[in-house]
């Protein structure tokens, strides 16, 4: 007998709550694992994923076939796709996490009080970590690896478009957990038949300690707006690159701009808007625009303004363009009257991810760094560097654009919290 929508919804909600309660139950077990225990699981999981490549690719092909039948774009199909090389990359990511320092138990502060009490502030796991993400199966294993190494349990709510791939990946991990005598509830894949299952996860207060959304602006906004569980907002990236009148090397500035825009245009640290100082020679302004177009980038802007410096082929921009995270070979371009105007434009449209300046003026650079509100500010560097590995932090779960609990690349330490341990010798408070 076929279930109606109400039956599906009821069953799905029950499944989410069963998973959340199970995760809450096993969280203390994971929190007490030694670094050696966690590393052994991660390394065995890496090997098991590579060994199960054919199984994973077959499941992934089902998702690809269904995605094409539903009319998914080839760009989305590419994000969804897994092959031997990508599986090797995912396995390599687990090995990298195993090699990272374990943050759990790290003493990050403390002192001896005048009464002799010893105070220690130590890192401890967050607990049950929920992940809501879109059609990138690699996130399934990234989240598992980072959660485990930081002593957390993972509840994963992936996209329906990747459900077979995600299920195959988690099945491999479950076999490894079982071989180490650990419960499979260390990582669980939540049902994804309806969008409401996200709501079930993000309102499971008391069972889930934090939810991290990773995906497009709509997904992130929906989670942050509706959650009662604490959330960490991983950013949409409307990243700006400002080229100042005192730029010391225009060719270098153009190279940084092109790197930020074209290296990987579909990631959150890609440059989406270029702001050019109107005091720059018009030939330099034109050179910047031309370089973008020659690299295959479509330039959106004020047509009259940009044609006045000799540019052609400009797509008219409206208010939407200045706020747009294109995630494609498109860029918004505007001429601005100096660094203050650039900072005002950024303040108006920024998602507070990464903002960059190209200048040879130390005072201007410092002014920009001090006044721009963003998780990362680049001075004479590409926006593409906002990345946990590039920052020397190792693997990351995402880039946080909020100010609490973490900001910027979220690596292992950012997936912990702290507690105070106070060692006394019988002291009582007067």
Swiss-Prot record:
Primary subcellular site in the record, as a coarse category: cytoplasm
Subcellular location: Cytoplasm
GO terms of molecular function: glutamate-5-semialdehyde dehydrogenase activity; NADP binding
GO biological process, one term: L-proline biosynthetic process
Organism for this UniProt entry: Corynebacterium diphtheriae (strain ATCC 700971 / NCTC 13129 / Biotype gravis)
Gene3D superfamilies membership: Aldehyde Dehydrogenase, Chain A, domain 1, Aldehyde Dehydrogenase, Chain A, domain 2
Gene behind this protein: proA
Catalytic activity: L-glutamate 5-semialdehyde + phosphate + NADP(+) = L-glutamyl 5-phosphate + NADPH + H(+)
Entry function: Catalyzes the NADPH-dependent reduction of L-glutamate 5-phosphate into L-glutamate 5-semialdehyde and phosphate. The product spontaneously undergoes cyclization to form 1-pyrroline-5-carboxylate.
Pathway the protein takes part in: Amino-acid biosynthesis; L-proline biosynthesis; L-glutamate 5-semialdehyde from L-glutamate: step 2/2
Enzyme class: oxidoreductase
NCBIfam families: PRK00197.1, proA
Protein name: Gamma-glutamyl phosphate reductase
GO annotation, cellular component aspect: cytoplasm
Documented EC number(s): 1.2.1.41
UniProtKB keywords: Amino-acid biosynthesis, Cytoplasm, NADP, Oxidoreductase, Proline biosynthesis
């Amino acid at each position: 007998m076929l279930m109606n929508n109400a039956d599906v919804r009821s069953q799905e909600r029950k499944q989410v709550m069963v998973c959340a309660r199970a995760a809450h139950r096993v969280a203390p077990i994971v929190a007490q694992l030694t670094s050696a225990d966690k590393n052994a699981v991660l390394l065995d999981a890496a090997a098991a994923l590579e060994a199960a490549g054919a199984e994973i690719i077959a499941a992934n092909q089902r998702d690809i076939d269904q995605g094409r039948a539903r009319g998914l774009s080839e760009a989305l199909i590419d994000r969804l796709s897994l092959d031997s090389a990508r599986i090797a990359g995912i396995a390599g990511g687990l090995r990298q996490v195993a090699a990272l320092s374990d943050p759990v138990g790290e003493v990050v502060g403390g002192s001896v009080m005048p009464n002799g009490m010893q105070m220690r502030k130590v890192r401890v796991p967050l607990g049950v970590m929920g992940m809501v993400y879109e059609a990138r199966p690699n996130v399934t294993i990234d989240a598992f690896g980072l959660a485990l190494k930081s002593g957390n349990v993972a509840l994963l709510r992936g996209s329906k478009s990747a459900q077979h791939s995600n299920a195959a990946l988690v099945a491999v991990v479950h076999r490894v957990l079982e071989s180490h005598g650990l419960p499979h509830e260390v990582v669980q894949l939540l049902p994804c038949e309806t969008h409401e299952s996200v709501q079930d996860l993000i309102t499971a207060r008391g069972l889930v300690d934090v939810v991290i959304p990773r995906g497009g602006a709509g997904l992130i906004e929906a989670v942050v707006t509706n959650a009662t569980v604490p959330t960490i907002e991983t950013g949409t990236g409307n990243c700006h690159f400002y080229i100042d009148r005192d730029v010391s090397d225009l060719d270098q500035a153009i190279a940084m701009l092109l790197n930020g825009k074209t290296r990987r245009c579909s990631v959150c640290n890609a440059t989406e808007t270029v702001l050019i100082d109107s005091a720059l020679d018009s030939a330099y302004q034109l050179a910047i625009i031309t370089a973008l177009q020659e690299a295959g980038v479509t330039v959106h802007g004020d047509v009259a303004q940009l044609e006045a410096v000799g540019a052609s082929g400009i797509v008219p921009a409206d208010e939407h363009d200045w706020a747009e995270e294109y995630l494609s070979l498109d860029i918004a371009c505007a001429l601005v009257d100096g660094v203050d105007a650039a900072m005002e434009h950024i303040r108006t449209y920024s998602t507070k991810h990464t903002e960059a300046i190209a200048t040879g003026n130390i005072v201007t650079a410092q002014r920009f760094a001090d006044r721009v509100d963003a998780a990362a500010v680049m001075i004479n560097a590409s926006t593409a560097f906002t990345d946990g590995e590039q920052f020397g932090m190792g693997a990351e779960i995402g880039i946080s654009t909020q100010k609490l609990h973490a900001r910027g690349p979220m690596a292992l330490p950012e997936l912990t919290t702290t507690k105070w341990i106070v060692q006394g010798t019988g002291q009582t408070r007067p």
